[in-house]
Amino acid sequence: MAAKFLRFSYMSNNAPHRHHYVPRMVQRNFTNESGGLHFWRRGMNIGEVRITKPSNLFVEDHLYTIVDKNGARDHSIEHWFGRLETLAAPFIQQFLNIVRHGMTPIMNGTHWDLWHIYVYHAQKRTVAWHKRFLTPEDLLAVMKEIASEQQWREHIRAWETDAEDTLREMNNARIASQADPMPDKMLVEFRSRGLVIYVAPPQTSFILGDDMSGDALVSSRGGTTDARRVQFMPIAPDVAVGYCDTRGVHTDHLTAMDVRRMNEAMAKQSYLIAGRSKAQIASLSRIPYDPPDIMKGWFKSRNGALPACLP
């Protein structure tokens, strides 16, 4: 299964130029009865909430497009993400149906690996943050970290000769890395973990943000009195998921305050938030902005850390 959808074909020119960094198949799980999502983005007035369709949210032009030196555009990575989402979408819907009937999903090895790979690449789809926040100097710092001494000298010469073309190549490399397969060592680590299903109580709902996952302090459980930190990824208004140290699939029924804290954590790190409730999004628009340190996260991942949805 993993090998099937990790195969990659280059030089595909027939693709939409609008690329979603939060998949529409996830966004559609959050829409209201009319198929819309309430949203707010920084720069809008506090409390000013609008509504639109998933096709217009969490999207940028040519986000995953590689450009050659002649200006030709290659959309292979967008096609690749589309194939991955085509595999993940029916699995997620079946998963949600089981949870909503009060049952615990039974996952075989194929299900687990599909989920691990989907989560891994969902975490890597922070290219929008890279594009918005990283400077050429940041990209050079990344290059220096991964290059040999000889490669670094060659890169500096190229930068001094043609900075614009060198920056294009650096951007291409950063974009292409989104489709790099999960390292075998990391997949082994994923397989050693369990899955927690976080269920929101009635009259509450999760939101979506720029990053598909977050972490928050929630109430205690199991007789303890201390708050606990959980890392989670919302996949529907009533369901989020995360990893844990105990193998198997586990269900965690949250309180309304838990969901609020998790939504505040998502809003705090996001430029754009969206959800089913207009009043909820208006309230969360008051949360101050504290975006994640991308460079710190990148260097941490280079040292073998697991993605953010893992404890």
Model regions and ranges:
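Alpha-helical structural context detector biased toward long hydrophobic helices
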Residues: F5-P311
